[in-house]
Amino acid sequence: MEGVQTMFAKFIDVIQTFLTEPAILIGILVGVGYALDKKTPIKIITGMISAMVGLMMVLFGGFQFSATFKPVAEAVSKAYGVHGYLMDSYAMKAATQIALGDNFGYVGYVFVLAFFTNLLLVLFGRYTGAKGIFLTGNTGVSHSQAVLWLIVFWLGFGWVQSIVIAGVLTGVFWAFSTTLIVKPIAKVTNNAGFTIAHNQMLGLWFFSKFAHKFGDPEKHDAENLKLPGWLAIFNHNVTAIAIVMTLFVGGFQLATGIDNVQLMAKGKPWYIYIINLGLQFSMYMVILLQGVRMMVGEINGSFKGWQDRFIPNAIPAVDVAALLPFSPNAATLGFVFCTFGTIFSMGILLLIHSPIMVLPGFVPLFFSGGPIGVLANRMGGYRSVIICTFLLGIIQTFGTVWAIPLTRLAKEGVGWTGIFDWATLWPAICELLKFIASTFHLGPYSI
């Protein structure tokens, strides 16, 4: 019996390994899709590699954005002596891993069950309406461990029951949240053939409902602003991003004092360090743009095979960074005003002496503000970007304040992801779990 359990555990590990390597997974799906469509071996191989390299460029560019800005945010917090719970995906990963302790290994079972639940719902899409297949493996693992912890804490069931409930719940969330935004994403990307799998699917859907009310996407497009005189330099995407990010990030850094900036510069003149940061942000956006072009081209060409032979409704759901190059100026503007909305909300928390203070990481600011800025621009122009992303910063901040006590992770002193879906829907689900637990004397309410 132990041998069978060991083999099953190894089988789950192998599946999880493939599912958590998004580039390899996309490559396999593209290759099989081309094979099903009876393409030549050369096309199958070149398509697989192009898709894998493209997605790796998207992930690399996204990671570098985070890695570049993280020390800046930490320096600002330290300089002003502001302490609190971190709004960041990595904070949620760390906190839930600590909470699960020695049982963290069960997360793999939840993740695999969630993926196959998602796949099953799409397979029967004629009846369920589900279309999106969640392919962002690293984010999927983060979801799996968070949901497993919430189920274990609030319901207090055994591990088998908790794994099943968490896996099915996560898979249902993936299937329908990715499907919910198929039409808005198609509009933003000019029918590129994918949807989004990350932490702000409901956020994209929510803002798509009213982003068009704040302007004309043709007249007020952030990518086609007709600026007079020397301001025309901002009509060039690469230049605009470099200058805006140099001023924005540089302003944050200089607010901590030139001596602190010089320490971060590690031997370089502080002003050269700030200029380089702005140029790096622009470079990472160019990398993202090229990666998205490569990946989307192959996904469009290959998924016809899958749709014709097996899953007619299937739409691949990929990392949210894939949206950014569709409107780079709007992505930058969205990041800036999401940050302003977050700072505004933190000011309110300080004024009312909130017992919970949250500090934003880079991920909820850029990878929520940026994509929602892109969507808002395509629907209502730059004025919509400003309004929607400022509101986004407020929602994410106060939603995280709502979520932290409900997750019962506050004692770990780490934080919560803070991104839209996990600052709105999941705290509401926690309230429901809390009600069930108190009604039936489960989990923390058990006698």
Model-derived segments and spans:
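A short glycine-/small-residue-rich loop at the edge of a beta-strand within enzyme catalytic domains
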Residues: 67, 94, 286, 290, ...
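Membrane-interfacial helix-loop connectors
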Residues: 136-155, 339-401
